Amino acid sequence: MPPGCRAALRELPAAKGPAYSYAARLMLIDLHAHTWPRSHDSVLNPDDLIVRAKQAGMDAVAFTEHDTVWDFKSIEELRAKHNFLVLAGVEISTDDGHILTFGIDKYVFGMHRSRELASYVEKSEGVMVAAHPYRRQMPWFSRNDEEYQAALEKASRNPAYQYVQGLEELNGRGSDKENEFSRRLSAMMDLPGTGGTDSHAISDIGKCATYFEREIHDERELIAELKAGRFYAVDLRTGKPVATRA
């Protein structure tokens, strides 16, 4: 984390945690990370990811494997082993793109349809965030303002976006231009933006995160804060927050 970035975050009085001595401060959380073998395209061991995330200044990290949900017992063991908040999520592949989902306990056939996914998430009192919304949407070969605007408007009509509580404005594996498209889309739709590294390797960790205005100790508190919109994306390479809404 760049010098001064953490210092810019307002410290809170020490709090009595429910189970572990998590950092008593406004929180930086990486909301998008993958580990092997639950995500076949990752080379990250869960323990290595946690160690590196702590070194990078994270207060928590969410494991969001592809269409695979971590069981609570394994998550609890990792929390205790590292005295670090690990959150269980899942990245669901739908016909309308990838959706970061929190609050569900299993993958159910049919979740590739965003409407069915949203129905299950609602029943589970969970939350959905659109991952890397620039994918297959951003115009690569045209810098014409009119065509760029048309691409944003087309992306905003994605059927899945009527169900999400936020868009991933900063993706650690996305280029500056790709993330700029996501930021503009987020502003157009008046949706708050998250940040996640989308880590698949050690070198991915620590690039960006989501800054939460209140402390979080578990998935339920994470879901509540996402629904309340009390967060914004932070680029940890520059230390600069990303805010698209007034």
How would you describe each model-predicted region?
Residues 114-115:
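Ordered, amphipathic secondary-structure segments that act as subunit-interaction surfaces
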Residues 30, 50-67, 127-129:
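Divalent metal-dependent hydrolysis catalytic cores, especially in the metallo-beta-lactamase
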Residues 66, 131-133, 196-199:
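Short, well-ordered beta-to-alpha junction loops that form the rim of enzyme active sites
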Residues 2-31, 35, 39, 43-52, ...:
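Charged catalytic cores and adjacent phosphate/nucleic-acid-binding surfaces used
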Residues 129-140:
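Aromatic-lined carbohydrate-recognition surfaces of secreted/lumenal glycan-active proteins
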Residues 121-126:
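Core dinuclear metal-dependent hydrolase active-site scaffold
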Residues 89:
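Substrate-binding cleft of extracellular glycoside hydrolase catalytic domains
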